[in-house]
Amino acid sequence: MASVLHSTLEAVENERNKLDTLFLHMSDGVVAYDGSGKLIHCNPAACELLGRTADECVYSELFESICPFSHVITMQRSDYVEGELTVGERSVELYFAPFSDEESGGVLIVLHDVTEQRKTEERRKEFVANVSHELRTPLTNVRSYAETIREAGDDLSRETENDFLDVVISETDRMTHIVQDLLTLSRLDSGRSEMNMARFPFSAAIDSVLRSTELEARRHKHELTHDYTENLPLIMGDRGRIEQVMLNVLSNAVKYTPDGGHIRVTAGSEGETVWMEVADDGIGIPEADRSRIFERFYRVDKARSRESGGTGLGLSIATEIVQRHHGSLTLVDRPGPGTTVRLELPITQPIGGEDSHE
C-alpha cells in the first residue's frame, strides 16, 4: 500500500511539474484566482503583458470592470467570456472561465497579445480606404468629362473636346498604374513574384537608369551628375527589379526637386555589399514624415505627387523588392536641405534564398 501511495504521489508531482513548466514558458499569459478572488497563479508572460508584478495583479483593479468576478465564478465550466484590455500601447485579448463548478473553484484568465494583429487590421482598413480614394478621384474626373462631352454635343469645339479627352486618357492611365502597382504588391506579398536571379554588373544597371532619366532631368533643367567607377562588382539579383528600384528613387528626385536643382548619383562597394546613393538639393523631407515615406500610399506632397502621376506605391514596392534581395533602402541623415536615399545590396545571395529561382 505504501509503495502504491508513493507511486501515485510521484505521478501527481510529475504532472504538476509538467504543468508548471508549461505555464512558465508559454507565450500567452495565465492568471488564476481562487473562489474568494485571491491570486493563486500568475505566469511570467501574464506579468509582462500586464506590466505588473504578480502581487499587483489584483482582480478588482484589472478585470472587474471588464467581467465581474461574481459572474465568471457562477458560469458553467464549459462557458467562457471574451474581453480586451489596453495596457499602454499594447492590446491584450482576455478569456475568462471558471476552472471548477464547485463553490471552492476559481477563475482562470488567459491573456493573448493581439497588438500586431490590431495594427495589421488598422493598416488593412487604411489601405482599403486609400485604394478607394485613389480610384474614386480619377473615376469622378472621367465621368465628369465624359458627361460634359456627351451633353455639350456639337457646342464643344474640337480643341476643347480633345483637351477633355486628354484628361480622360490621363486619368485612365493613372488608374491603370494604380491597379498594376497593387497587383505587383500582391504578388510580392504572397511570394508569387519570382525573381529572375543572375549575375550582372551593378554599374551597368546604374548606367541604364541614368540614361532613362536624362531627358526628364533636362526638361526640369536639373544638373544630373554621377560619380562611380565602372569596375563595381558583379552582383546576384534580378536586374530588371533592381533597375526598377533605382529608377523609382532617381525619378522621385527628378520629380520632387524644384526646377534647376542638382541631383547626384554615387555608388561603391564595401566588403560583400554594393551601394548607390541618390542625393538632391530639394526642400527635403520633414522629420515627421521620414519614418513613413516607405509606407503604402504615403506621400509627403500629395498634390505634386498626383500631378506627376504618382500612385504613392512606388517606394513601398521598391522596399519589397530590396528586402527580397536581402538588402536595404533607407534615408540618409545629412545636414542642410535635400534628400539622400541609399540602396544597399549583398553581392551574393544566401543559399536557399532568392537565387534558388535562378
What are these regions (language model features)?
Residues 55-116:
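PAS-family sensory/regulatory modules and their coupling/dimerization elements
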Residues 190-195, 234-237:
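Conserved micro-motifs of the catalytic ATP-binding
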Residues 196-200, 218, 223-233:
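Conserved catalytic submotifs in the C-terminal HATPase_c
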Residues 260-272:
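Short beta-strand/loop element within the Bergerat-fold HATPase_c
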Residues 327-328:
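Conserved glycine-rich
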